[in-house]
C-alpha cells in the first residue's frame, strides 16, 4: 500500500522535526517538539509522546509506546514478536512501553513485551530481555542492573 506523505504527516505537529528518508505510517501518533532523525520507520499502532528524540536508523513497530521526554539512540532495534515466522496465523502482538524520561543507548535491542521504567537508562549495545525498573541503569548482553540513577 502506498501512502502520500501529506496523508502520513497530517497528524504530526508543526513543532516536531522529521528528517529525510523517514517512513511514518498514517495512524502513528506523534507528539509535540519531537525530533525524528533520518532513516527511521514508524508503524501505525505507535504512540510517541512529547519532547522525544529518536536518532537515525530506528524502526518503531506496531505496539510500541514511547512516553514524553525519552531519548532513543541511533540504530536501536525494537521487536514486537517473540516467536517470528514468515506466516503465523497465531501471531500475538507483544506491546512494549518506554516510560517518561527513559534513555536507550545506541545499538541496543529491546525485546517485546517489556516496560522500561521512568528515567531508566539502557547502556549502548545492550540487549534488554526483561522489564527495567524506574530510575535504574542497565547494561550488557543480556542487560543487567548496574546502579540506581539520581534524577
Feature locations, PLM:
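Short alpha-helix at the nucleotide-sugar/activated-sugar donor binding site of glycosyltransferases
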Residues: 71, 120-121
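Conserved G/P- and acidic residue-centered "switch" motifs that form tight phosphate/ATP-binding loops
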Residues: 122, 140
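Extracellular disulfide-bonded cysteine-rich modules/repeats
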Residues: 135-137
Amino acid at each position: 500500500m502506498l501512502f502520500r506523505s501529506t496523508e502520513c504527516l497530517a497528524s504530526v505537529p508543526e513543532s516536531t522535526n522529521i528528517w529525510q528518508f523517514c517512513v511514518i505510517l498514517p495512524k502513528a501518533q506523534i507528539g509535540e517538539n519531537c525530533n525524528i532523525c533520518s532513516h527511521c520507520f514508524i508503524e501505525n499502532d505507535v504512540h510517541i509522546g512529547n519532547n522525544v528524540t529518536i536518532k537515525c536508523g530506528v524502526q518503531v513497530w506496531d505496539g510500541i509506546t514511547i512516553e514524553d521526554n525519552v531519548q532513543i539512540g541511533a540504530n536501536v532495534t525494537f521487536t514486537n514478536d517473540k516467536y517470528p515466522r514468515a506466516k503465523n496465523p497465531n501471531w500475538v502482538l507483544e506491546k512494549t512501553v518506554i516510560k517518561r524520561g527513559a534513555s536507550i543507548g545506541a545499538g541496543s535491542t529491546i525485546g517485546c513485551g517489556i516496560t522500561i521504567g521512568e528515567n531508566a537508562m539502557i547502556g549502548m549495545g545492550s540487549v534488554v530481555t526483561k522489564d527495567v525498573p524506574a530510575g535504574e541503569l542497565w547494561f550488557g548482553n543480556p542487560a543487567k542492573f548496574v546502579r540506581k540513577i539520581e534524577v
